[in-house]
């Protein structure tokens, strides 16, 4: 294990809803539909987060649980069957239907797994029905994707062929560049989960080597391991250094010559470092406090310190999978406080005491901190931005330079007005 100081606290948390993952998953798989079984609040959240145009035909919706459902006065299963049948009659192009649990559906113990099993029998293969939980109870907002991908793993066909499997949603253009780069390295068979069509699932088996693109896919990784796949240990592909080490792990697993890997990646690394240079000048020496929300916090901290020169005040993470994060923890500076869990009031006290230059946090905490003249960065923005790979290192750094620049402008305006 690395030299970071691992700490733990518990208490009241500031969290965002796991249903948010539908926003990037429904864009990834256009032949899938995500049906949330929840309240009107769930419906408003998804519609607001996705920013649906008025004339668009969305690939998600909400089966709203009414007061009778919540009180147990109506058979929610019958009503859900009716909604599903109406949906499939109106949208025959749907190939995979995800039933997504929410806080309300979990409170009333609605068994969506049983509903999905029954519907699969009735639909007889015309549409595949899967289920997972997007509830915000005891989860982070990124874990919705973990639940969705875990539900897909049992449907993946068996294969003993040697292949590389990239697991986790990335921007299509970024994924295309990475796959092309792996091919240049000498790995010809590269597939991804989730696929771009929900029915075009990659195969898995003893010959499969898995690279995780996101650090919050713990359950999916466990399911793939149970299917015989090997999970490669590596830092995550954020920044030039992390992406290089990530790709080197795959090359090593496939026995590719080290010199060939170095020669292939060297020009990309040089270009990335040159593009990073102006942002490093803005970020170097600045102090950053990462509050726990997305589970990207540790890889981001490694990138911001090692490639941008930022000082790490505290690195919060909702949950710490030590095995999955071992490669990242080893790259953090000595005695970096890594806080697993959250007592939001105590963390805010530490933020106010330390007065960092930048705080990465949830939207609910950003405005109050900005009012106290502390620059903030929404953690959810990092999920929706194309930040993976060597080529995206400068774009990732810019996301952190921007709020500091904004804060400087505001401070200058205040000085002028005074």
UniProtKB/Swiss-Prot annotation:
**What UniProt keywords apply to this chain's record, in alphabetical order?**
4Fe-4S, ATP-binding, Chlorophyll biosynthesis, Iron, Iron-sulfur, Metal-binding, Nucleotide-binding, Oxidoreductase, Photosynthesis
GO MF terms here are: 4 iron, 4 sulfur cluster binding; ATP binding; metal ion binding; oxidoreductase activity, acting on iron-sulfur proteins as donors; oxidoreductase activity, acting on the CH-CH group of donors, iron-sulfur protein as acceptor
Pfam families annotated for this entry?
A: Oxidored_nitro
EC number assigned by the record: 1.3.7.7
Signal peptide start and end residues? none
> Catalytic activity, per the record?
chlorophyllide a + oxidized 2[4Fe-4S]-[ferredoxin] + 2 ADP + 2 phosphate = protochlorophyllide a + reduced 2[4Fe-4S]-[ferredoxin] + 2 ATP + 2 H2O
* Co-factor requirement: [4Fe-4S] cluster
Q: Name one GO biological process term.
A: photosynthesis, dark reaction
Question: How is the co-factor bound, per the entry?
Answer: Binds 1 [4Fe-4S] cluster per heterodimer. The cluster is bound at the heterodimer interface by residues from both subunits.
Which enzyme class, named as a word? oxidoreductase
Is the keyword Iron-sulfur assigned to this protein?
yes
- The UniProt annotation places [4Fe-4S] cluster binding at 17, 42, 103
| Pathway as given in its UniProt record | Porphyrin-containing compound metabolism; chlorophyll biosynthesis (light-independent)
Annotated function: Component of the dark-operative protochlorophyllide reductase (DPOR) that uses Mg-ATP and reduced ferredoxin to reduce ring D of protochlorophyllide (Pchlide) to form chlorophyllide a (Chlide). This reaction is light-independent. The NB-protein (ChlN-ChlB) is the catalytic component of the complex.
Q: Which PANTHER family match?
A: LIGHT-INDEPENDENT PROTOCHLOROPHYLLIDE REDUCTASE SUBUNIT N
The protein's assembly and partners:
Protochlorophyllide reductase is composed of three subunits; ChlL, ChlN and ChlB. Forms a heterotetramer of two ChlB and two ChlN subunits.
Per the similarity annotation, which family is this? Belongs to the BchN/ChlN family.
Return the protein name: Light-independent protochlorophyllide reductase subunit N
């Amino acid at each position: 294990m690395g030299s970071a100081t691992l700490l733990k606290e518990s208490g009241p948390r500031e969290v965002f809803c796991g249903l948010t993952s539908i926003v990037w998953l429904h864009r990834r798989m256009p032949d899938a539909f995500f049906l949330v079984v929840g309240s009107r609040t769930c419906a408003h959240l998804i519609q607001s987060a996705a920013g649906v145009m008025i004339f668009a035909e969305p690939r998600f919706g909400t089966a709203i649980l009414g007061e009778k459902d919540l009180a147990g006065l109506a058979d929610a299963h019958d009503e859900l069957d009716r909604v599903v049948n109406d949906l499939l009659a109106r949208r025959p192009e749907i190939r995979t239907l995800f039933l997504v649990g929410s806080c309300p559906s979990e409170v009333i113990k609605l068994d969506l797994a049983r509903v999905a099993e029954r519907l699969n029998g009735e639909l007889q293969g015309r549409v595949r029905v899967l289920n997972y939980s997007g509830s915000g109870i005891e989860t982070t907002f990124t874990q919705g994707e973990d639940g969705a991908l875990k539900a897909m793993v049992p449907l993946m066909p068996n294969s003993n062929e040697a292949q590389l499997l990239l697991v986790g949603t990335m921007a299509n253009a970024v994924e295309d560049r990475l796959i092309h780069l792996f091919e240049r390295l000498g790995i010809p068979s590269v597939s991804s989960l989730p696929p771009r069509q929900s029915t075009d699932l990659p195969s898995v088996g003893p010959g499969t080597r898995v690279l995780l693109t996101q650090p919050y896919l713990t359950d999916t990784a466990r399911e793939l391991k149970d299917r015989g796949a090997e999970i490669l240990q590596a830092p995550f592909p954020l920044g030039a250094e992390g992406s290089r080490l990530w790709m080197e792990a795959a090359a090593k697993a496939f026995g590719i010559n080290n010199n060939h890997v170095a020669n292939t990646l060297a020009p990309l690394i040089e270009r990335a470092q040159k593009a990073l240079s102006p942002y490093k000048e803005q970020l170097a020496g600045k102090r950053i406090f990462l509050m726990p929300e997305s589970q990207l916090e540790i890889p981001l901290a490694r990138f911001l310190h090692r490639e941008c020169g930022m000082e790490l005040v505290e690195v919060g993470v909702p949950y710490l999978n030590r095995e999955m994060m071992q490669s990242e923890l080893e790259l953090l500076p000595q005695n970096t406080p890594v806080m697993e869990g959250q007592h939001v009031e105590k963390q805010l006290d530490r933020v106010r005491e330390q007065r960092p230059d930048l705080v990465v946090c949830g939207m609910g905490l950003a405005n109050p901190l900005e009012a106290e003249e502390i620059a903030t960065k929404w953690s959810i923005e990092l999920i929706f931005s194309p930040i993976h790979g060597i080529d995206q290192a400068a774009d990732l750094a810019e996301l952190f330079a921007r709020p500091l620049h904004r804060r400087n402008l505001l401070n200058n305006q205040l000085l002028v007005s005074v």
